[in-house]
Amino acid sequence: MRDIKTYLSVAPVLSTLWFGALAGLLIEINRLFPDALSFPFF
């Protein structure tokens, strides 16, 4: 059980989860607001 905790706490796993969540967030933002290039002009 300790080996599983050690594996889940290493940086590649955490960075994969982080970048996956960030990619999902960016996809949802682009789905709700399709043209992000128009944001600076508001």
From Swiss-Prot:
PSI consists of a core antenna complex that captures photons, and an electron transfer chain that converts photonic excitation into a charge separation. The eukaryotic PSI reaction center is composed of at least 11 subunits. Only detected in green leaves and not etioplasts; PSI is only assembled in green leaves. Disulfide bonds: none annotated. Its main location: plastid. GO terms for cellular component: chloroplast thylakoid membrane; photosystem I. InterPro entries: PSI_PsaJ (IPR002615), PSI_PsaJ_sf (IPR036062). One of its GO terms (biological process) is photosynthesis. It comes from the Eukaryota. The chain crosses the membrane at residues 7-27. The gene is psaJ. It is a single-pass membrane protein. This is Photosystem I reaction center subunit IX. It comes from Hordeum vulgare (Barley). The keyword Phosphoprotein does not apply. It is found in: Plastid, Chloroplast thylakoid membrane. Belongs to the PsaJ family. May help in the organization of the PsaE and PsaF subunits. PANTHER family: PHOTOSYSTEM I REACTION CENTER SUBUNIT IX, PTHR36082. Keywords: Chloroplast, Membrane, Photosynthesis, Photosystem I, Plastid, Thylakoid, Transmembrane, Transmembrane helix.
